[in-house]
Amino acid sequence: MENFIQSFLQERGYTVNDKAQTIIKSCDNWYANRCIEDFHQRKTVQGTPYELSRMNFAKRCCADDANLCEIAEVNGGENEAQHEYLLDMLEKNRFLSMYRKQIENVSAKGTAACYVRLDQAEIAQDGSVSGGRIRLNYIKAENFIPLTVENDEIKEAAFAGTELKGGKVRTTLVDFILDKNGNYVSETNVFDEYGTRIPELTTVVQLGEVKPFAVLRNAEVNNIDNMTGYGYPKLWGAIGVLKAVDLCFNVLYGDLDKADKLVLVNELLCKFDELGNPITPNEQLKKTFVMLGGEKLPEQKDLVQEINPTIRIDDITKAFELCLSLLSMMFGYGTKKYSFENGQIKTATEYAGERQDSMQELNKQRAEAENYIRDICRAILWFSNTFQGTTWNVDEEITADFDDSYVTDRQSELESKRADALSFSSIPKLTIWYLMDKYNLSEEEANKIYAEGQVDIDTDAETED
């Protein structure tokens, strides 16, 4: 976060949490696979600088975490027109793809946010607004500033972002503050590349009691001191293990890098050119054979001696296993989230498909995600009613369907539905549901096929007319 943003908020009586921003920045460095100066940069015993290789396993962990909380569809309520409107607005704002990125960032840095804004709206002198296009702004943890938190609920917040406009850097700060009547007031301030506020671009808009922003946080309790309003960044607790994973990889890489076979050859066996250089049959042998004088051989009685460096694969594998088990526990999915089995590394998504003991952790995060989606949709509906003259039901129950393909075995699920349909053949609905799921049909299409008897469920083949 820019220093002038912090100073501006402090002048208005707010405190910016420096410690939280420091922790978030540290987690972001690991997530972005940046070189950590005090860890990855090393020196040899001769003082020659070198850099450790990096596996970028932090990104892998966060991506797998996000896979388990991916959304399949948002349900906008029983009103079909309202449902379609919400889906259209979310699609125009690329919500599903941006949510996928945000949930991954939440795993890494603990927090993400979104607020609703109006583009190209008409603002009257009294602050009233009409028209415009409803847009969603997606915010990363480093650009989110909680201002007022009550019972762990964020009541007031500010959001900062930097962009390039007309070749000039502009930083925008948007805050949402409650007035004495319990209604939100939005104030937008714009700063130039030097951190100077541009007064003519400042706008103040009177909103209502519906919160115009939503915050997505890690469902796990944040036990880090002085991080009120922020979610727990999982990478923060895993940094030590991530270092160990990189060290394991560098040991393996070092062994492989020095694993080329060497052959020490007595000079008595070599031919030499006119300059005294040994002649080898081809270029490859120059890398393999090393000519030494007879007195330099480890055993002078030997004319040829092979050196085959050892690759410590068993020791390295055990070290990797320990690190991956610790990393699994750090992310809350037991000790087998990542493991070597039959010579293969199993990812979190593969493991969760076989074992269901991670579902409790997952369900907590899904509940948090559903609240986030519900808050965004309510804000969209309120903006539409207030500024565009619609009459949507803001209190309509809004839910999200999550993609369970990562935590369920689809083939086993289909077999179970097929068995139910065969066992209870007197209940046509079971067969229709099976056909819908198996062949990705609508209920109308499945009913038609069932009525015409086009599918024999015993063989899953179409019957002949």
Model region roles, listed by residue range:
Residues 447-465:
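Extended, compositionally biased alpha-helical segments that mediate assembly or anchoring
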Residues 25-54, 295-330, 346-371, 397-434:
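Extended, non-catalytic structural segments that build the interaction scaffolds
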Residues 332-346, 375-396:
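Short acidic alpha-helical/loop segments enriched in Asp/Glu that coordinate divalent cations
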Residues 1-148, 153-154, 462-465:
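Extended, helix-rich architectural segments
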Residues 113-232:
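Extended, regular secondary-structure scaffolds
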